[in-house]
Amino acid sequence: MAKLTVKDVDLKGKKVLVRVDFNVPLKDGVITNDNRITAALPTIKYIIEQGGRAILFSHLGRVKEEADKEGKSLAPVAADLAAKLGQDVVFPGVTRGAELEAAINALEDGQVLLVENTRFEDVDGKKESKNDPELGKYWASLGDGIFVNDAFGTAHRAHASNVGISGNVEKAVAGFLLENEIAYIQEAVETPERPFVAILGGSKVSDKIGVIENLLEKADKVLIGGGMTYTFYKAQGIEIGNSLVEEDKLDVAKALLEKANGKLVLPVDSKEANAFADYTEVKDTEGEAVDPGFLGLDIGPKSIAKFDEALTGAKTVVWNGPMGVFENPDFQAGTIGVMDAIVKQPGVKSIIGGGDSAAAAINLGRADKFSWISTGGGASMELLEGKVLPGLAALTEK
């Protein structure tokens, strides 16, 4: 990576500003998945071990008006982080002002402070989300000229707490998580060990057009599953019953199939049901066509076997999007089958591009078998699309 990293700067005695991604799910004030907090620990620990004073920034959820602040405080995160670090985390509970400044100035080497939810600044004119120049400048002024961006999950957004701070400090550097994310995903796409197979699922073709186009140029094969299968089917005149379809994307699907030159591998059967939720019948289709009155909710057994074969010998695999409605046990065989086909390849570099695929791997007990699971759905999608991430572009060159 051609950007400075946290190891390239002297941190001792410095107030170090750090953008982390603590956007964790909360239920009744309790964190239900702490993966993102755990993922940030190596960078935070390194800073405090080097004698730096870590000042952490993160958003949590969406905040548009005063009422949205309810249940969005980072207080539970501060408590969880303190337990994980085995030391106190100073939490002033504000995003600016004398109280915050006093708490920062009172920090000693090796201490950690967490600023309140950066999106609380969105209540009055979206200052955080629209990268308000004054806010970025103010937050930058709270440190000693060093900013560490370790929030891959927001690297595709230009916010005051990442791009804004970066532009107002002497050195803006990457944390370990951001560095690893870029290394795994970018290297997999740009300089893969071959054969390189990409697997794309999820419900909408519209979400993945750019990704499919980019990966058709880079990968040896692109396997398609999930709800978007049926838009590709309909584009070829295959019956899809009541399956999900994007009528306005049929021409796009047709064009992608023509451009693919045989690289796009589609399912050859489906697991179908006579309703999405209150169904009374579930069965496998004979072939590609979905029966009238039914909808496809997972890839079928023949498709699992076909995808298993397509993955044989693969050395690099990037997977983004489940093969079916994996949250329902009746429709998770496709996602499980593809996961198992990926991880059994000898010496494979296997990467999950965040979002629902990461949730599937975690919920279905396969997470530890993958080389890398991305912490950022939107950011990893944009990297797979070949886009430049604003949060990364704003960092200091080596």
UniProtKB/Swiss-Prot annotation:
Q: What class of enzyme is it?
A: transferase
Residues reported in the UniProt entry to bind substrate: 21-23, 36, 59-62, 119, 157
Q: What is its EC number?
A: 2.7.2.3
User: What gene codes for this chain?
Assistant: pgk
Q: Per the record's keyword annotation, is Ubl conjugation included, yes or no? A: no
Species source reads: Streptococcus sanguinis (strain SK36)
Against InterPro entries, the record matches this protein to:
Phosphoglycerate_kinase, Phosphoglycerate_kinase_CS, Phosphoglycerate_kinase_N, Phosphoglycerate_kinase_sf
The disulfide bridges present are none
**GO MF terms held by the record:** ADP binding; ATP binding; phosphoglycerate kinase activity
> Which residues are recorded as binding ATP?
208, 296, 327, 354-357
The text of the family note is: Belongs to the phosphoglycerate kinase family.
Protein name, please? Phosphoglycerate kinase
Q: Which UniProt keywords apply?
A: ATP-binding, Cytoplasm, Glycolysis, Kinase, Nucleotide-binding, Transferase
In what pathway does it function?
A: Carbohydrate degradation; glycolysis; pyruvate from D-glyceraldehyde 3-phosphate: step 2/5
